[in-house]
């Protein structure tokens, strides 16, 4: 453990942020991290809690409690406290090969399950400790290419380069298999590259990691739309195993009048256009969907909706409203949501903080949905009719659904982004490989194996939309199954 009395001696201290009105002037990361010395003090707060739920990764109430990767959190907290940064990095990478990603975008399931947080009211700064470890590793030159000492002679094609694709590629390459990753976009990274804005995950962080993987022998092929322009049968015939890691990219849409109005977009298309234009030309090409000078309506209150808020503010939108279908969560845990369950409480993310600073309001309007999009004679979006909702319980099934109250209001807007989640993987890749899907629209599997010989599946394409950390866990577990299939056993 770290310092015996650390959780009593020190209070929680986290990184500060660039002020909201200053940071929305650009798309840069905005956290001002603690010094290594300050981070060592924070690591000292990790207590000898007996049952470290922070690393449990168990499902409670349908949600994860603790880290899905089962990171050895108490171990590397102790090592950080002692100043043994290189050893802390080694212990961290035992379970997580991509801490530079999770330390930036993970919602810190570990901290929500932290015993210190339950005892003192403030958890250990696990995510920021992780960030300090990995960035110290890069700064000191400890993170560099380490190709496998021998090759097995087996080849694996991985379709998709998002979190699960990168994870399965990493582990199979460590094992010595020849790994080729096919990505349909022009850059590697999938969700990490185009689904998460640059201010949340700077794309140089992804590129830095990809260069190491390439130096270790992983081959990346971009602009390769397998199942589309690239024949799936050719891939099947050319590799000893194939892993489908194409995500759950079929977005949930709104089937309401006026959906065809010019100015209504799926959120993922919006975020992709902005990041691509930023990387290609620093917005000089004018190809990004642009919220400048426009009122923006965002439908959906999850991470993607929040990212749309932050992006629209940086572009210079004139107003912002975000619709949330469900009731506003409580500020404190309810009696039926005890620790160490994930806390179902009201959270204020960076997008809401920035909107409050810019417009003096939280953009979220709870228990609402779009009834109709309004448009002018040219088909341009001019507004939306928004219905208020109320929960209603079905006496026969016991299920609760949100139904209209009959009360409505109209919001004048010129852009609307639908961030209502995803309903499964896209059809064409699954159909091209002939793999079966389940009722939820995900590829059906038996221990990551599909119904087609030598074709595996992992990540959101298998489990449905989830977190980056779950994608990394899926890739790690799937790699072991692929290795077992190829070699008859696995040491992953």
Question: What are these model-predicted stretches?
Answer:
Residues 177-193, 320-330:
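Glycine-rich FAD pyrophosphate-binding loop
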């Amino acid at each position: 453990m770290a310092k015996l009395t650390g959780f009593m001696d020190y209070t929680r201290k986290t990184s500060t942020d660039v002020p909201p009105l200053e940071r929305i002037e650009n798309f840069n990361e905005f956290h001002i991290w603690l010094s290594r010395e300050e981070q060592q003090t924070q690591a000292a707060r990790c207590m000898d809690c007996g049952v470290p739920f922070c690393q449990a990764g168990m499902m409670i109430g349908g949600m994860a409690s603790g880290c899905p990767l089962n990171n050895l959190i108490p171990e590397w907290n102790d090592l950080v406290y002692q100043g043994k940064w290189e050893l802390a990095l080694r212990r961290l990478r035992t379970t997580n090969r991509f801490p530079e990603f999770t330390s930036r975008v993970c919602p810190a399931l570990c901290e929500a399950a932290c015993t210190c947080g339950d005892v003192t009211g403030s958890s250990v700064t696990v995510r920021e400790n992780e960030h300090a470890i990995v960035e110290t590793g890069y700064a000191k030159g400890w993170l560099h290419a380490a190709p496998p000492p021998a090759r097995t002679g087996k080849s694996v094609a991985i379709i998709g380069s998002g979190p699960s694709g990168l994870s399965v590629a990493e582990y199979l390459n460590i094992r010595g298999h020849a790994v080729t990753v096919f990505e349909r976009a022009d850059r590697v990274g999938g969700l990490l590259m185009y689904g998460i804005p640059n201010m949340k995950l700077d794309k140089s962080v992804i590129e830095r990691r990809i260069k190491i993987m390439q130096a270790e022998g992983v081959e990346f092929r971009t602009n390769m739309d397998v199942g589309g322009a690239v024949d799936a049968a050719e891939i099947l015939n050319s590799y000893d195993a194939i892993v489908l890691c194409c995500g759950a990219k079929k977005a949930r849409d709104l089937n309401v009048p006026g959906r065809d109005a010019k100015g209504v977009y799926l959120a993922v298309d919006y975020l992709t256009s902005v990041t691509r234009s930023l990387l290609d030309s620093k917005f000089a090409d004018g190809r990004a969907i642009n919220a400048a000078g426009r009122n923006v309506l965002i439908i959906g209150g999850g991470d993607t909706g929040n990212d749309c808020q932050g992006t629209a503010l940086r572009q210079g939108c004139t107003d912002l409203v975000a619709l949330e279908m469900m009731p506003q969560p409580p500020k404190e845990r309810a009696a039926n949501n005890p620790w160490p369950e994930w806390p179902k409480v009201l959270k204020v993310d960076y997008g809401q903080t920035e909107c409050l600073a810019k417009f003096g309001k939280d953009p979220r309007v709870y228990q609402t949905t779009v009834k109709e999009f309004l448009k002018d004679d040219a088909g341009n979006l001019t507004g939306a009719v928004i219905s208020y909702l109320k929960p209603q319980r079905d006496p026969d099934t016991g299920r609760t659904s949100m139904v209209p109250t009959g009360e409505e209001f109209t919001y004048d807007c010129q852009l609307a982004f639908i961030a209502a989640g995803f309903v499964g993987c896209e059809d064409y890749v699954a159909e091209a490989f002939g793999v079966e899907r389940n009722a939820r629209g995900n590829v059906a599997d038996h221990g990551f194996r599909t119904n087609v010989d030598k074709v595996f599946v992992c990540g959101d394409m298998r489990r449905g939309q989830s977190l980056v950390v779950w994608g990394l866990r899926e890739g790690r577990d799937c790699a072991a199954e692929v290795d077992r299939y190829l070699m008859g056993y696995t040491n992953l």
